[in-house]
């Protein structure tokens, strides 16, 4: 699930993933929420897990964060502290978009290039693509940290280490 949070209007997304949503699923998907916590009804998601309507879930955004539902955290395959957009690439892109919006607002129409820092090791040697991807980011590490100490949600998020996205690397077997 990746959608903005819209509370009112013709197409609200608040609790978009609710009991009705999960009941309508034809297969048992792996449910991923990386948008806004309130787009998913936590209790409906837990019931969907109980009923086998979904195979498993990966949650990066939570209702009521930083006070996250501990039952859901413990039942998630992967649970992270709202860090999906925390890569150096994501931050550079957001900075560029902000600069361009400000430039447009003031009638300057500037085009900006904001480059993230180079990764410490640009070439990744791995036997498979999965192994290569896990070497640059393993979500189970973040999940373990959050599950070990959920009260540190904001600390884990605030002190998040710099990482680059896949396109910053060259993979070789």
Predicted regions and their residues:
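Structural detector for helix-capping/boundary residues
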Residues: 19-20, 43
């Amino acid at each position: 699930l990746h959608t903005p949070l819209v509370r009112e209007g013709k197409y609200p997304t608040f609790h978009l993933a609710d009991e009705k949503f999960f009941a309508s699923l034809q297969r048992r998907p792996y449910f991923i929420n990386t948008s806004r916590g309130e787009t998913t009804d936590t209790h409906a998601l837990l019931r969907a897990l109980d009923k086998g309507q979904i195979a498993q879930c990966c949650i990066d955004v939570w209702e009521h964060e930083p006070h996250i539902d501990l039952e859901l955290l413990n039942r998630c395959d992967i649970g992270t502290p709202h860090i999906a957009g925390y890569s150096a690439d994501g931050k550079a892109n957001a900075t560029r978009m902000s600069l361009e919006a400000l430039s447009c607002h003031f009638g300057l129409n500037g085009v900006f290039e904001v480059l993230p820092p180079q990764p410490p090791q640009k070439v990744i040697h791995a036997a498979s693509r999965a192994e290569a991807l896990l070497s640059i980011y393993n979500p189970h590490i973040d999940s373990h940290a959050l599950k070990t100490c959920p009260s540190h949600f904001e600390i884990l998020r605030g002190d998040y280490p710099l990482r680059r996205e896949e396109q910053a690397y060259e993979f070789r077997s």
